[in-house]
Amino acid sequence: MLNADLKQQLKQLLELMEGNVEFVASLGSDEKSKELKELLTEISDMSPRLSLSEKSLKRTPSFSVNRPGEETGVTFAGIPLGHEFNSLVLAILQVSGRAPKEKQSIIDQIKNLEGSFHFETFISLTCQKCPDVVQALNLMSVINPNITHSMIDGAVFREESENIMAVPAVFLNGEEFGNGRMTIQDILSKLGSTADASEFENKEPYDVLIVGGGPASGSAAIYTARKGLRTGIVADRIGGQVNDTAGIENFITVKETTGSEFSSNLAAHIDQYDIDAMTGIRATDIEKTDEAIKVTLENGAVLESKTVIIATGAGWRKLNIPGEEQLINKGVAFCPHCDGPLFENKDVAVIGGGNSGVEAAIDLAGIVNHVTLFEFASELKADNVLQDRLRSLSNVDIKTNAKTTEVVGEDHVTGIRYEDMSTGEEHLLNLDGIFVQIGLLPNTSWLKDAVELNERGEIVIDCNNNTNVPGIFAAGDVTDQKNKQIIISMGAGANAALNAFDYIIRN
C-alpha cells in the first residue's frame, strides 16, 4: 500500500525506535479490514522491533499501538493514511520509548492530570488540522496511563459519524469536548491544567519580540536573528493560518506545496537560528513604557522588549447573520478540505465569490451532490480561469446579487435564507451544509487601544511597517496592507525586521 519512496523514508524513521512495539488489530472480512491488515503487515515487516497480532476491539477495523504486554491507550479506527500517516509513525516512535519534543513543563502537566480521560477524535483523511489534535492526544495517552485516545475515520465509521459535521471532533468520556484545531496546551487548558508562568520569569529583555507565528513572523524572526538581535516569538503555533491551507502553488521557486509542509519548513528554518520560539501561548496585552515595551501573556507572564513586531494574522470572517453562530460545526464550516468529505452526496452552499470561494466550490463539487455558490456582488471576483472551471461543472449553481440573511436549523443546518437584491424577493434553499469563504478577520481584539486600527480592525501601518506607536511594528494579514498573500506577508515581515533594526540603532 506504500510506494517505494514512502517505504524508504519509513524504514529510516523506524530505525529510531528504542523498544519493541506491537500492533493489536481487530479485523473482519470486509475490504477495509483487508486493507488495514495489508498496511500493518507491510509496516511490521520493515522492522524486527514491530509485530502484529489480532484481538477483538471496540471497532472493526481498528488497531492499537502497544508495548509488548502493556496497553498504551493509543488506537486507530480506520486506515491512517493521508494526513494521518504521520500520526501513526509518530505514535510508533513514542510508544517505542522515543522521547517527545514537547517541553518538560508540558510533559509534567500531562503526568499530573488526575482522573480517567477517554478521548475519541473523529477525523477525515483529507483534514490538515486533524493530525495536530490526534498527535497531541496520542502523546498524552503514552505519557499518562489514565488517558486513552482513539482516532476514528468518519468515512469508515459512517453510522457513528452521521451527525459529525466538522472535524476534528473530539469527545471526552462520551461527551463533546471540542472541535477544530487544538494544541496540546489548548487541551490541557480545557482540562483545567494551567501553564506554569515561572519559565518566563527569568527571561532577559529582547531586542525584538514578535507576536504571532505565521509567514510574516517567521520572516521577521529570521531577519532580526541574522542581524544579531536577541529575538523572541510568542505564538499559538508556527505557520499560523497557513496550516489550514491545502495547496500552495504561487510561492515563487516552489512549484507546489501544502500548508502543513510550508509550516513545517518554516519551523525548521526558525530552529536554525538563535530564536526563542515560545509556542502554545497567546499574548493578551501590550503596553509601551519609558523602559520597554511590555507584552502580557495569557498565563500572566510579562515579557519585555526594545521593539515588538505584531504579526498575529487573521482568522475566518463570519457572516454575522442569525443562526450562524449556534450552527458552527453543525453544518456551518470554514474549511472545505477538512469538512468536505462529511457532506458526501449532500447539498451544500458556498458563500463568497472570490478565489477562495470558487476554489472551495470546485473542490466540493467532486464530493457532494450539489453546490450553490452565493455572491453578494453582481459578478464573481475570482480569477477567470477559476470561473471557467466552475461554470463547466454540472452540479453547481451560481447566484449573484444574493444577500444571505439567515442560517436555518435547530440541531444542524437545514437551509439558508437569502434575498435576491435585483428583485427584493426572499428565498429559502434547503441544504445540509454551508461553507463560509468571505475573507479574513484580523486578530487584533487583544490589542484594545494599544495601536491605531482602521474600520476593519486592521493595524494601520506606513511603508516601513511602523504603527502609530514608536517601536511597535506590524506585518502580514493583521495590517491594512491590501493584498493578503503568503509571499507578501513574508516580504512585509522582512521589511518590519529591518526597520526594527534601524529603530534600535537610532534609539
Curated annotation (Swiss-Prot):
Keyword Flavoprotein assigned = yes
Task: Extract the InterPro entries matched here.
Answer: AhpF_NTD_C, AhpF_NTD_N, Alkyl_hydroperoxide_Rdtase_suF, FAD/NAD-bd_sf, FAD/NAD-binding_dom, Ferredoxin-NADP_redctase_2, Pyr_nucl-diS_OxRdtase_2_AS, Thioredoxin-like_fold
Extract the GO molecular function terms from the UniProt entry.
Answer: flavin adenine dinucleotide binding; NAD binding; NADH-dependent peroxiredoxin activity; oxidoreductase activity, acting on a sulfur group of donors, NAD(P) as acceptor
List the top taxonomic levels of the source: Bacteria, Bacillati, Bacillota, Bacilli, Bacillales
This one is known as Alkyl hydroperoxide reductase subunit F
Q: What does this protein do?
A: Serves to protect the cell against DNA damage by alkyl hydroperoxides. It can use either NADH or NADPH as electron donor for direct reduction of redox dyes or of alkyl hydroperoxides when combined with the AhpC protein.
Q: What else is known?
A: The active site is a redox-active disulfide bond.
The answer to whether the entry has keyword Protease is no
